[in-house]
């Protein structure tokens, strides 16, 4: 019997997954509801439409997103192939002519003899091997079906996330490790502020520029957590009873309680990333760097994921997904793209690539592959399936997700080059297997 896989959604992840399947001789039934039913963000009927920016971000190997793109080139990604063909001048970044980019992918995928395209909305998950790659604007009917399948609590609609910072960039001389009232182990890094420092920060925060909301995001703006800048505008002391509450956080150096304290919580298993507790925000990214850099200890903080606020639909991957992108409770069902909690065009396509390869292996009765954590593709799969279940939020690829090198290298560029070299060596070994 001919082996086949259903792929739901022809965005970046679904198109890439489809390509990886047909490359391996697997027939694909590809379902895409556009243009019969449009989303509020899409404008065309093309596959892999870029709805926001036309940039696929940095191209160099001293940047994690450059590394993941190179890994995808090694694994014959159609998304990166198309991006390279449709590229436009953008300094050290890979930016594309968005029409040429999605046009090329649509033509290659649609016209492949093993692909059957179904232009219809899918409202229930089909039987048999299936990849769900329906993105952050998944239609309500299918979202409800996924919710039933993954468990009531495991489909999140979120509208806020706090920034995540690289631990190495925090000034450890200015912060201290402590949990409130010394309960349990000392689990938080604490950034103490004097009254003067707090007032300087407060003034900068309430006058900072926020990012514009897209029309389709407005309805969900205030359904979730309150942005820190909105809280601050309610009064100068509001934050002191909220995220900056100093009680129980006396500074061990002075024995005194600071005027205000920002807590940083470990965000990954390796302890290389920390998030700003309660600091979900909609400030522009440049403003986040400027304003949050006024907090003692964060003057030179490297923000690996900026605080964001927009509508999104994603499953609680640490609870429900394997690092192979398979559902724990149904091994012939794979998820890919932003729905898994990867953030960004390239990351979505990379997850589609991994899910496509693994779905092909599954139907051919071969072993599915857990991509090595040393690779960018593997580090992302590892993060989304092993992060904190309670506070899971979407993540871009970044070097903070990679396992540390055996010996510490202080120079950032040299360290990143070594991480990149190790990642590409790991992915070349995967390429030999698949």
Curated annotation (Swiss-Prot):
Its cofactor is FAD. It catalyses: uridine(54) in tRNA + (6R)-5,10-methylene-5,6,7,8-tetrahydrofolate + NADH + H(+) = 5-methyluridine(54) in tRNA + (6S)-5,6,7,8-tetrahydrofolate + NAD(+); uridine(54) in tRNA + (6R)-5,10-methylene-5,6,7,8-tetrahydrofolate + NADPH + H(+) = 5-methyluridine(54) in tRNA + (6S)-5,6,7,8-tetrahydrofolate + NADP(+). It is an enzyme of class 2 (transferase). Its main location: cytoplasm. GO terms for molecular function: flavin adenine dinucleotide binding; tRNA (uracil(54)-C5)-methyltransferase activity, 5,10-methylenetetrahydrofolate-dependent. InterPro entries: FAD/NAD-bd_sf, MnmG-rel, MnmG-rel_CS, MnmG_N, TrmFO. It is found in: Cytoplasm. GO terms for biological process: tRNA methylation; tRNA wobble uridine modification. GO terms for cellular component: cytosol. The keyword NADP applies. Pfam families: GIDA. FAD binds at residues 9-14. Belongs to the MnmG family. TrmFO subfamily. NCBIfam families: gid_trmFO, PRK05335.1. PANTHER family: GLUCOSE INHIBITED DIVISION PROTEIN A, METHYLENETETRAHYDROFOLATE--TRNA-(URACIL-5-)-METHYLTRANSFERASE TRMFO. This is Methylenetetrahydrofolate--tRNA-(uracil-5-)-methyltransferase TrmFO. It comes from Listeria welshimeri serovar 6b (strain ATCC 35897 / DSM 20650 / CCUG 15529 / CIP 8149 / NCTC 11857 / SLCC 5334 / V8). The gene is trmFO.
